[in-house]
Swiss-Prot record:
One of its GO terms (cellular component) is pilus. Pfam families: CssAB. This is CS6 fimbrial subunit B. It comes from Escherichia coli. Keywords: Fimbrium, Signal. The lineage of its organism: Bacteria, Pseudomonadati, Pseudomonadota, Gammaproteobacteria, Enterobacterales. It is found in: Fimbrium. The keyword Signal applies. Its main location: other. The keyword Signal applies. Residues 1-21 form the signal peptide.
Length: 167
């Protein structure tokens, strides 16, 4: 298990250059990404996990990675933004594709696992938080687009991206 401390995430300020961003502003959030497979972390205003060799027989609701976040002073709410847009109501954060069988797509969603209240995959990801409190999130596999009942083991490629915004 590889553990990497990720520097503070850069957050979009106000509405400058962002449509419908509301009053979300820059706040530093300490994020610790616990990577359970062979991945390369890359930070670009988001936590982006790029699979290198994910050899697996995927199981529903299996965790791909977890994110631990400590809330700094002055932050009372956090919003998780998936890859597609700032206004999406679902929290799909990406898709992995079997490199030998492109019909086998694994859809991943973010899930809040700890802290005050929980939300499950697909629910809106804006929630209240407490200062100096740690929260844990996980990327979970919730199904794919393969028409048959199972997925074959193999190498899956793609990327999962999630941004954390604070008020």
């Amino acid at each position: 298990m590889l553990k990497k401390i990720i520097p503070a995430i850069v957050l979009i300020a106000g509405t400058s250059g962002v449509v419908n961003a509301g009053n979300w502003q820059y706040k530093s959030l300490d994020v610790n990404v616990n990577i359970e497979q062979n991945f390369i972390p890359d930070i670009d205003s988001a936590v982006r996990i790029i699979p290198v060799n994910y050899d697996s027989d995927p199981k529903l609701n299996s965790q791909l990675y977890t994110v631990e976040m400590t809330i700094p002073a002055g932050v009372s709410a956090v919003k998780i933004v998936p890859t597609d847009s700032l206004t999406s109501s679902g929290q799909q954060i990406g898709k992995l594709v079997n490199v030998n069988n492109p019909d086998q797509n694994m859809n991943y969603y973010i899930r809040k696992d700890s802290g005050a209240g929980k939300f499950m995959a697909g629910q809106k990801g804006s929630f209240s938080v407490k200062e100096n409190t740690s929260y844990t999130f996980s990327a979970i596999y919730t199904g794919g687009e393969y028409p048959n009942s199972g997925y074959s083991s193999g190498t899956y490629a793609g990327h999962l991206t999630v941004s954390f915004y604070s008020n």
